[in-house]
Amino acid sequence: MEIKVTEIRENKLLGRKEIYFDVLHEGEPTPSREAVKGKLVAMLDLDPNTTVIQYIRSYFGSNVSKGYAKAYETRERMLYIEPEYILVRDGLVQKQEE
């Protein structure tokens, strides 16, 4: 698996970096969110506790997936802005039982 960052935008209003990337996975299934997040965090020297993978999209017959991640400056900012289901899906918070 190889990750190529295509664009990084600085969003000062929301206190985050918006990262667009391509994942090359020749002869492999679409990589998991955890694998992509781990490699992206290591590549860009980000904090894994404030980085959220928004999506990874695969296209039929292609060995390249496109993704979008957000890296927040603080955990408080991330918890305020991101919907709970995305934080649960990325393993950053536990699902609250009603």
UniProtKB/Swiss-Prot annotation:
GO molecular-function terms, A-Z: structural constituent of ribosome
Disulfide bonds: none
Keyword Nucleotide-binding: no
Keywords: Ribonucleoprotein, Ribosomal protein
Any GO CC annotation of this UniProt entry: ribosome
Keyword Transcription: no
Highest taxon in the source lineage: Archaea
Subunit structure: Part of the 30S ribosomal subunit.
HAMAP family (alphabetical): Ribosomal_eS24
Protein name per its UniProtKB record: Small ribosomal subunit protein eS24
UniProt organism field: Thermococcus kodakarensis (strain ATCC BAA-918 / JCM 12380 / KOD1)
